């Protein structure tokens, strides 16, 4: 008889082991056997919980996107009466949260984006994540700008966030958070009306 709560513990172990493997050898070279060894379980456990490597990658990406959503929402909930500028900075902060810019998370995101072009389930996850970011940004800009301007500003800020993140991921160096926040703050203030 399985121990109560063991499923969530095992899933967490396997997702963490997947992130470690992707960080060290890349998604394509990470094998089920390597991931199982890192997690201290048999390969059969992975099949039991996730079917196969694609199922495990999907669960890993769902976990990372969930962490992203939580990082953004926690910051927004702390600012219920915040200005549009403050709330836009909170969204930026969530996207540059440590859960999203650690070496393992960045490599997993890169692998996820590449795989999403060929795997329908990962593509759907990627689209949900991208739409959520754009929707959140446009919603906040919309508090101060007409619809078309808000959409353009939201799209531009999403591109800036993704671009800063991608440049850091491909550089192999940690994201320069002060610079990233300075650049995004400048973009935001350029697009919001002055008082």
UniProtKB/Swiss-Prot annotation:
Entry keyword Transcription: yes
Keyword presence, DNA damage: no
Pathway: Amine and polyamine biosynthesis; betaine biosynthesis via choline pathway [regulation]
Domain of life: Bacteria
Gene3D superfamilies xrefs: Tetracycline Repressor, domain 2
Pfam families linked to this entry: TetR_C_6, TetR_N
Residue stretches making up the HTH tetR-type domain: 8-68
GO terms classed as biological process: glycine betaine biosynthetic process from choline; negative regulation of DNA-templated transcription
DNA-binding region(s) in UniProt: 31-50
Coiled-coil residue spans: none
Single GO MF annotation: transcription cis-regulatory region binding
Keywords (A to Z) from UniProt: DNA-binding, Repressor, Transcription, Transcription regulation
Function: Repressor involved in the biosynthesis of the osmoprotectant glycine betaine. It represses transcription of the choline transporter BetT and the genes of BetAB involved in the synthesis of glycine betaine.
Name by which UniProt lists this protein: HTH-type transcriptional regulator BetI
Organism placement in taxonomy: Bacteria, Pseudomonadati, Pseudomonadota, Gammaproteobacteria, Enterobacterales
